[in-house]
């Protein structure tokens, strides 16, 4: 978009806040504010969406309806939709690494559905044409390699009464990782703190697709939250990893040696304090996690 010289007021950034506004449970503390400051650095408005109560409330649901979806509105207020109809049911288990989104419910309930709800339930998007850009790449998984580069989005209603024309475009589906880092370097972007500590992709801190070294690293960064996860595994009788409990899995891994106290502090703070675009006197460097361990969505 920057290369095409498109006016910044015609595009907006959206971010699905996995943990919502109540507490940090599964995601990096710094991620929402990093996204906020990233958007500001490029002069782009950003709107956040989340499920009320976030990951934790959805996981702890017991004979209850799923919570409403929440989304920021242009006037600064919060819109809410859903959570009032359907059949009460129970989760009390972590999402599992699977292609089926009913099993991998963190993707469907906390990302995909929340994004769609923010579009479908705002009348300002009626009688408009919307293009959603998303950054999936084919190198990330065999499943993502099959994604269409261009297709109608699930929020599309171009033939309905609201005439809401919504397409999804995946402009970097066929990019290599080298191409991604090249454009990041060109615009002198300081990436999310997790990359500098050794992560090869920025997802949740405790992403269910994480490998043994990532979970060992996450444990070194947030030991209290790992203990809570371990206790919940025992309570549920269901583990994040299919073959063993989380503490056993962590013991098989090695924390990344690029984790420093300084980066730990930045990554676990709710406020991001560094410039997103590097100042002229600071040299851009490839982060430790670049071209590292590949473990992501199936």
Which residues are covered by each model-predicted region?
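Secreted/luminal cysteine- and crosslink-motif detector
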Residues: 107, 158, 205-208, 270, ...
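Peripheral terminal appendages
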Residues: 1, 5-6, 34-53, 121-124, ...
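ATP-dependent adenylation/nucleotidyltransferase module used to activate substrates
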Residues: 1-186
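Local cysteine-cluster metal-coordination motifs and their immediate loop/turn environment
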Residues: 200-212
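A short, structural micro-pattern
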Residues: 126, 198-201, 223
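Immediate flanking context of iron-sulfur cluster ligation sites
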Residues: 188-201
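Residue-level signal for mature regions of secreted extracellular proteins and peptides
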Residues: 99, 197-200, 288
């Amino acid at each position: 978009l920057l290369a095409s010289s498109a006016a910044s007021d015609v595009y907006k950034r959206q971010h699905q806040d996995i943990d919502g506004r109540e507490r940090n449970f599964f995601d990096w503390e710094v991620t929402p504010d990093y996204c906020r400051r990233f958007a500001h650095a490029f002069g782009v408005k950003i709107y956040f969406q989340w499920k009320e109560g976030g990951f934790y409330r959805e996981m702890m649901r017991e004979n209850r309806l799923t919570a409403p979806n929440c989304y920021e509105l242009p006037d600064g207020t919060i819109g809410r939709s859903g959570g009032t109809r359907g059949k009460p049911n129970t989760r009390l288990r972590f999402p599992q690494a699977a292609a089926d989104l009913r099993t991998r419910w963190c993707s469907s309930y906390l990302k995909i559905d929340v994004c769609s709800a923010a579009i479908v339930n705002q009348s300002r998007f009626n009688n408009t044409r919307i293009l959603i850009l998303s950054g999936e790449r084919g190198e990330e998984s065999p499943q993502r390699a099959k994604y269409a580069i261009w297709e109608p989005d699930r929020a599309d209603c171009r033939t309905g009464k609201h005439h809401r024309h919504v397409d999804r475009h995946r402009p970097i589906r066929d990019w290599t990782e080298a191409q991604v880092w090249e454009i990041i370097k060109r615009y002198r972007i300081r990436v999310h703190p997790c990359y500098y500590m050794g992560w090869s992709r920025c997802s949740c801190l405790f992403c269910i697709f994480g490998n043994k070294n990532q979970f060992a690293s996450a444990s070194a960064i947030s030991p209290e939250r790992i203990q809570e996860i371990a206790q919940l595994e025992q309570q549920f009788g269901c583990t994040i990893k299919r073959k063993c409990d989380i503490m056993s899995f962590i013991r098989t891994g090695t924390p990344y040696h690029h984790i420093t106290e300084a980066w730990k502090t930045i990554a676990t703070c709710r406020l991001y304090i560094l410039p997103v675009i590097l100042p002229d006197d600071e040299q851009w460097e490839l982060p430790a996690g670049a071209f590292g361990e590949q473990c992501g969505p199936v």
